[in-house]
UniProtKB/Swiss-Prot annotation:
Homodimer. This is FMN-dependent NADH:quinone oxidoreductase. Its cofactor is FMN. The keyword NAD applies. Quinone reductase that provides resistance to thiol-specific stress caused by electrophilic quinones. Also exhibits azoreductase activity. Catalyzes the reductive cleavage of the azo bond in aromatic azo compounds to the corresponding amines. PANTHER family: FMN-DEPENDENT NADH-AZOREDUCTASE 1, FMN-DEPENDENT NADH:QUINONE OXIDOREDUCTASE. Keywords: Flavoprotein, FMN, NAD, Oxidoreductase. Coiled coil: none annotated. One of its GO terms (molecular function) is FMN binding.
Amino acid sequence: MKLLHLDSSALGATSISRELSAAIVAQQRRLYPEVEVTYRDLDRDPIPHLTAQTLAQTDPAEAAAAEAVMQQFLQAEVIVIGAPMYNFAIPSTLKAWIDRIAVAGRTFHYTANGPEGLAGGKRLIIASARGGVYAEPSNDFQEPYLRQLFGFLGIDDITLVRAEGVAYSPQHRADALAAALAGLRAEQDAAVMA
């Protein structure tokens, strides 16, 4: 099994989404010892944002790099994304990666009945970290966007592991992380029992 692990937080070692995504990948390694993991840190190794030049693909090296990103995505059976909430949405580095994989004719196509995803059969696990608590859907453009986008690509097996309110206090941060990790352990136990 091939697993693609992406982190997008700019907070480095203090990042909750990075800690959660690492725990998810460790869980997958325990459940599936044969898993092959490809890791990309979108903060340390960002993908260029789309411009007229990148869309034209006139630079062979840039075109090859974009194709490598696409192949990593297409070959992965499981995708783990560390996705913190920045200003109600996702980091621009994650959006730049999404722009490279959401490509007509590759991961979706248009039909007489509307668009159809071509990237089904994958499992997506999102490690979501939020400084506040966003129970009101009108304030959350992160998780709905990720669900919509990956659903559009044909991925319907989506799991969210969320730690929220992490900016309220050190105790709230610790409690939110512990609750998210406990949820992961419960999921792992259920998978082992199945």
